[in-house]
Amino acid sequence: IALYRIVFEEFLILQLGLFMFKNGTTEVEGIKFNRDENLDNILKALPFKLTNAQNRALNEIIEDMQSNKVMNRLVQGDVGSGKTVVALLALANCVLNGYQGALMAPTEILAEQHYISLSETLKPFGMEIELLVGSLTKKQKEKVLERVKNKEIDILIGTHALIEDKVEFNNLGIVITDEQHRFGVRQRSKLSEKGINPDILVMTATPIPRTLALILYGDLDISIIDELPPGRQPIETLAVDKGKRDKAYNSLVRREVEKGRQVYIVCPLVEESEAIEAKAATELVEELKLEYFSDLRVGLLHGKMKASEKDEIMKSFKNKEIDILVSTTVIEVGVNVPNATLMIIENAERFGLAQLHQLRG
C-alpha cells in the first residue's frame, strides 16, 4: 500500500504540473487565423486525396488555428501515414493569413526532404520557402537571415540552426517540430519564443498508446493519423534465428539487390565491445565485403562520423551509389529512400521498442 501511495503521489504531482502548464498556455491569447479559401485550391492541386484520418487531423488543426488561444497539438501517425502533408497545409494556411511559418527537423537530410516537398507544392501558389541548415556557407546563411527578417521568406525549414539567436522572424505564426522526441522542451520553446504566441504543432511517428500519451504529453491536444494512404503496402516483419543468418544474407539481401533494390543492415554498436556481445557496424562491413558481397557496393554510416560525412553517405545511398548500407541507429529519423526495400536488424534485442518501430518505418 505504501508503494502504491508513493506511485500515486508521483503521478498526481506530474499531472498537476502538466495541468498548470496547459492552463497557462491555453489562457494565453494567440493568433486567430481564418481558414483561407485558397487552402482548398492547394488541396485540389495535390496529386492524391487525403485519407479520412488526414482530413480529421487537418480539421482539428484548422479549428485550433481559428481559436484565439495558442494551439498546442501533437500529431501522431505511423511512418508513411502522411503527417507531412497535414503540416504543409497548416503552414500554408498560416502564410495565407499573412504570417510566417517555421518547420524544424532533427537532421539536414530530413530538413532538405521537407524543403523539396513543400517547395513543389507551395511555390506554384507564390509562397517563398527557404532552407537554413548548418552546411550553408556564412554568406548563404546571412542572406537567408536577412530575407527572413524582411519577411521575404514565408516558410523557413531547418535544423537546430533555426533556434540560433541570429534568426529573427518578422511575423511568426506557427512553429512545427518534426520527430519531436529528438528535441528537448527548451529547444522547442526557444523556437516558439521567436514569435508572439505562435501556434505550436509537434509530430511523431513513435506509437504511444493514447492513455500514455495523455500522461506524457498532457500539455498537448492529440491528433492521431491511424490510416495509411491507399496503395501503401503493409510492412512484413520477420524474426530470423541466428542459425539462418547466412541464408538471410545470401538469399534475401542478394535477391533484393539483384532486383535493383537497396538494403539497410543495422547494428547496435559502432565498434566491438568486450562488455556487450553484439554486432558492431565497423566489423560487419569488413565481414560483408570479404565473405558475402565482394561484388557489391557496401557503405558504412555511424554516429561518430562528422555531420558532413553522414550527409554525404546518405546522399550516395539515396542516389543509388551504395547497394547495402551498414549503419547504427543514426538512420532512424525518417529519411525517404523508396528504393530501399529490406532492412536487417542485427541483435534486435539491444534496441528499444520505439527505436525498432522508427527503424521499421
Where are these regions (language model features)?
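Inter-lobe coupling/hinge segments of SF2-like helicase ATPases
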Residues: 28, 70-361
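Pre-Walker A segment
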Residues: 1-81, 85-102
